[in-house]
Every structure is written in structure tokens, then in C-alpha cells.
């Protein structure tokens, strides 16, 4: 389950162990293989929207009760580890580069996990990306918000029914 590990050192150890045992190790983000994402990647590669300049996304769900694994600090709970990884992997996958600068701001719960996080990424060539992730809708509501907007020099792609589930 995401994240693969809490720090780079542990991720490297996992990859070393996988290599030593001749097995594959990967994070299983189903959405990356969905027809929706495949079509978006093709539009970008074909230059339909020109050069990508800005990506904005959001993934917000209902809150969870305090017993849920997503709400416990010792199990790497919080919205960034649970939800923000989708926007991060999506942005990096679409832009095919690492950010030069990342800034984030979060609101934390009594359990000291982030419940709402805002992240801004700046890339060396001037591209920018931002995302919001959160577990803020009322616990008794089965709600979620998935949003994606990609702005290019010749147009944009907007998804208001975007799903990080791979639908």
C-alpha cells in the first residue's frame, strides 16, 4: 500500500532487496493505466494543447473515524500519504521531470496527521503545478472530489469527473 516506504533510504533498500531476489517492485497506481490517462498523455504528446505550463489537481474524500489506519500517525496516516501521492505521481508522470522547488502547507488533526494539504511545485523550465488533497468532507457523507486541469500554450484539458481509481 502507498506509500511504498516513508523515506528514500527505505525505498532504495526495498529495490536492492527486490533486485537481489530477481523480483519486481512497484507501486500499483491503477489510474496510470486507465483509458482516461492514456488519452491525456496522447493529447500532450501530440501537442494538442501545446507545451504544458500548469497542472492543477485535487483529491478530497470524506473524513475517516479515528480508528481507521489512514488516521494513525504510526501507520503513515494523513491525506498527503494517502491521497497526495496520486496528484504527485500524476504530475511527475505527465511532465516527465522532477520539480526544482516544492512548497506545502497543511492543516493537522489532533492525531497530528494532515487533514488538508496544499502543494505547489515549480520546475526548472518555468512549468508550475499545484494540488490539494484532503480528508475533510463529513464522515457520514460518502463524498469525494476529483479534479484535473492541464493548461498548455495552445489550450487546456479539464476533467471534472476525473477519478484516481482508474475509472
Predicted regions located by residue number:
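Hydrophobic residues in well-ordered beta-strands that form the structural core
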Residues: 1, 25-27, 56, 131, ...
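Beta-strand-loop-alpha-helix segment that lines the small-molecule cofactor/substrate pocket
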Residues: 1-32
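Short, flexible active-site-adjacent loop segments at beta-strand->alpha-helix junctions, enriched
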Residues: 4, 29-31, 58-63, 108, ...
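A short beta-to-alpha transition loop/helix N-cap that caps and shapes the active-site region
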Residues: 7, 61-67, 138-141, 158-160
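Basic phosphate/pyrophosphate-binding loop/patch that engages nucleotide-derived ligands
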Residues: 16-24, 38-53, 149-152
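Predominantly a Rossmann-like dinucleotide-binding segment in NAD(P)-dependent oxidoreductases
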Residues: 31-110
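Contiguous beta-strand/loop segments that form the cofactor/metal-binding neighborhood of enzyme cores
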Residues: 89-166
